[in-house]
């Protein structure tokens, strides 16, 4: 039971620092990840290609805090299956906040190619010369050569003996991207404010559970010192009547935007959980600007709806049922709508007139921003569930953005 409670209380994986290990087969990536965590997480073997799919582990690492460690397959894997493994390793870059490039110093050609990919993706990295326990002495010329050719800092490590691990942790802490302390509600709420959270019971959520954006918003408001009051759509009137003064902010599920907007006191700000997630994970200004593309859609247009979750859809699913129905009601039944889930996302988006993405609560910010940049680079408008719904209901100009 304690383990289950732990899972409910720990930081969501999407909010953790993502650290990925890259390197050729048998340079000791799995041994290093086990040494860093102090646990036997990754399978270690002398057989090349032991790690096939990326191995992911969430844990706390001082002084870094909550992290996700990702052990990848060797990027020198060969053959048809090896090529697939290498492609999966390449995909990991999209969600990586910091990379560790592991080498044994015997060859650097492939490491150079991969550090170029990391630089192109703007991912900070540190090189690790592993297995130094097999050397009588680590030549400074070897470290200098690795640093020169890979273009970054190099740390000599023995995953077996634990040498250099403290220095590696300190170096990783220095490389953490400086995003400042991000508040989910931004400047929409401050200490002492009363905030009303309108939360219809979501059939997608497990029994007895709230969906992640609701949990994160509640925690954000508590951290700020706000007074948070929760209600369902049916209890909005009673909740407002119970307050001496109108709430400074109302956060609602996007699906009932119009209902809440009609009941909102004049002095209260209005936003949605999806809009908050759009600003937290993506580019909210780009999403608002892109929503105007909805007005240009015709029955010959093509729309892609992207959902981060991979849950089995239920009736009245917002991405698969409600938004498509709203779009076709406005544009016409001929509108083509494609749906993708999880990490499935087309490389070529140019055949689409609009991308509508969920709040991405299951993705880390870097992964979501990578999708935003992909859309922007290909000239394809991209918006968010909450922004799209507000635009379709004609109330986007009344929604407050964080």
Place the predicted regions along the sequence by residue.
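Conserved G1/Walker A P-loop phosphate-binding module
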Residues: 2-83, 87, 91-94
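Structural beta-sheet core signal
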Residues: 21, 101, 127-129, 197, ...
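Conserved GTPase G-domain signal focused on the G5
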Residues: 28, 135-138, 142, 158-178, ...
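Short glycine-/small-residue-rich Rossmann-like dinucleotide-binding loops
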Residues: 37, 73-74, 104-105, 255, ...
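Active-site phosphate-binding and catalytic loops of NTP-dependent enzymes
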Residues: 42-46, 177-185
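Short, ordered loop/turn segments at secondary-structure junctions
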Residues: 49, 73, 104-106, 130-134, ...
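Conserved C-terminal guanine-recognition region of P-loop GTPase G domains, centered on the G4
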Residues: 57-65, 70, 80-154, 183-187, ...
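P-loop NTP-binding site
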Residues: 193-402
């Amino acid at each position: 039971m304690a383990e289950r409670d732990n899972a409910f209380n720990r930081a969501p994986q999407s909010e953790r620092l993502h650290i990925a290990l890259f390197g050729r087969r048998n340079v000791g990536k799995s041994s290093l990840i086990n040494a860093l965590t102090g646990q036997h997480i990754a399978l270690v073997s002398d057989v090349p290609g032991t790690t096939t799919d990326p191995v992911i582990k969430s844990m706390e690492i001082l002084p870094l805090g909550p992290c996700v460690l990702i052990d990848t397959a060797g990027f020198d894997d060969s053959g048809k299956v090896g090529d697939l493994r290498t492609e999966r390793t390449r995909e990991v870059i999209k969600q990586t906040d910091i990379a560790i490039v592991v080498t044994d110093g015997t060859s650097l050609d492939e490491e150079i190619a991969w550090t170029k990919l990391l630089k192109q993706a703007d991912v900070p990295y540190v090189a690790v010369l592993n297995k130094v326990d097999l050397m009588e002495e680590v030549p400074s010329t070897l470290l200098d050569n690795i640093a020169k050719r890979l273009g970054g800092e190099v740390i000599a490590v023995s995953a077996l003996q634990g040498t250099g691990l403290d220095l590696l942790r300190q170096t990783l802490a220095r490389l953490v991207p400086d995003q400042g302390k991000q508040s989910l509600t931004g400047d929409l709420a401050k200490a002492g404010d009363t905030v009303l959270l309108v939360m219809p019971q979501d059939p997608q959520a497990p029994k007895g559970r709230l969906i992640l954006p609701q949990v994160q918003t509640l925690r954000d408001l508590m951290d700020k010192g706000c007074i948070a009051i929760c209600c369902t759509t049916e209890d909005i009137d009673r909740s407002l009547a119970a307050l001496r003064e109108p709430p400074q902010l109302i956060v609602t599920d996007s699906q009932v935007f119009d209902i809440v907007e009609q009941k909102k006191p004049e002095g209260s700000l209005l936003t949605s959980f999806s809009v908050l997630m759009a600003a937290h994970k993506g580019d909210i200004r780009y999403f608002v600007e892109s929503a105007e593309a909805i007005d240009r859609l015709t029955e010959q247009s093509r729309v892609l709806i992207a959902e981060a979750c991979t849950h089995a859809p239920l009736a009245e699913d917002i991405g698969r049922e409600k938004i498509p129905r709203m779009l076709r009601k406005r544009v016409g039944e001929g509108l083509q709508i494609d749906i993708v889930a999880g990490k499935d996302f087309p490389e070529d988006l140019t055949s689409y007139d609009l991308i509508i993405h969920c709040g991405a609560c299951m993705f880390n910010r870097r992964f979501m921003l990578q999708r935003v940049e992909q859309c922007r680079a290909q000239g394809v408008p991209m918006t968010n569930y909450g922004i799209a719904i507000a635009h379709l209901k004609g109330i986007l100009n009344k929604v407050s953005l964080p």
